[in-house]
Amino acid sequence: MKKSFTLIELLIVCTIFSFFSVGIFSFFISQVHLQTQTLMLQQAFSELSFALDKMSREIRMAKKDDIEYKKVTKNCSGDLEGTDKLNFWPIPDGISFRDYENRCHKFFLQNNQIFEEAQPDIPALPLTSTSTLIIQNLRFNLTGESQNDGKQPKVTILIDAKIKGKYEMPLKVQTTISQADIDFEY
């Protein structure tokens, strides 16, 4: 008599093999989705990191407005009342200050992007793109911005963003920068 498999044994083996195949296929599909999500998150953090580094570097090197620096007196605040000899002053959805190259520098939110402008040399240029990241809110909290408050100037940057696309995830980033120059009265 020949030994062989019965129909029930073959069906059981095929069913077990099907379950393993579906499980392995599902695992690989989930890993592809996870990798896509991770790459989008890395791109978003890369953009936010670049924008924060750029803003931090410029804000750290800010100079007081309306004082002589490099033999030039610059008035970046315009005719705003109470802005004499300030380090920073708020603008709608942003911050403005005099930078170390005697330019009037601004960082602001426009069309869900962070923009930088340094007059007269640099027109408004985006620091973030809208292809992977949507900036929902950009806030600058100022401390010690006036000359006579006895505090070292500090700026806290708060960014609310979300990753654009299939895997929308909210991101909140905060950092605080103090001015490099010691704050004393002129």
Model-derived segments and spans:
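Short linear sequence signals and composition-biased patches located at protein termini or domain-edge surfaces
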Residues: A124, S131-Y186
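Type IV pilin-like appendage domain
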Residues: E68-N148
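Short, hydrophobic secondary-structure boundary micro-motifs
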Residues: F20, I67-E68
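A generic fold-level signal
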Residues: K2, E47, W89-P90, Q152
